[in-house]
Amino acid sequence: MAAKIFCLIMLLGLSASAATASIFPQCSQAPIASLLPPYLSPAMSSVCENPILLPYRIQQAIAAGILPLSPLFLQQSSALLQQLPLVHLLAQNIRAQQLQQLVLANLAAYSQQQQLPLVHLLAQNIRAQQLQQLVLANLAAYSQQQQFLPFNQQLAAAYPRQFLPFNQLAALNSHAYVQQQQLLPF
């Protein structure tokens, strides 16, 4: 029983220390060496340190390595910036060569793909010519149809007015409409 109580107290103490532990962010200027005991070896101190501090150590090492070489680094970066358009141009040339190789490998498919708009245009022209031939062949029927068009429109406009009373009666009372149709002379 005493062992269980002791374990419970230890767990409580560990959770309290974990809850109140302080974490040093990357931008902190606190030296890491002062946080670790001085009697630990450098290999042991790197193992024992908090994993959150690892990016801070890497950042410090990079800054220490770059600062003495900063003029050289600036010259190299400016040279790289000047070479970027050349790299872009080289990449475009490589893409163009790959496209040319693809075209040569699939010349038949490429030519069919290029001719698709022409095929659609040709089909539309053929349809238009067929329609023109149909109109020329049936010019007499076409002209008669155009001459009777105003008459047909007038007839279509007058037709619903002529049967309107019967249709209203049919809608209201279908039995009376049927009787009325039977009484009409043929």
UniProtKB/Swiss-Prot annotation:
UniProt-listed Pfam families: Zein
Keyword terms of this UniProt record: Repeat, Seed storage protein, Signal, Storage protein
Disulphide bond pairs: none
Entry keyword annotation includes Ligase: no
Signal peptide segment: 1-21
One term of GO molecular function: nutrient reservoir activity
Further comment: The alpha zeins of 19 kDa and 22 kDa account for 70% of the total zein fraction. They are encoded by a large multigene family.
Functional note: Zeins are major seed storage proteins.
Family: Belongs to the zein family.
Name this protein carries in UniProt: Zein-alpha PZ19.1
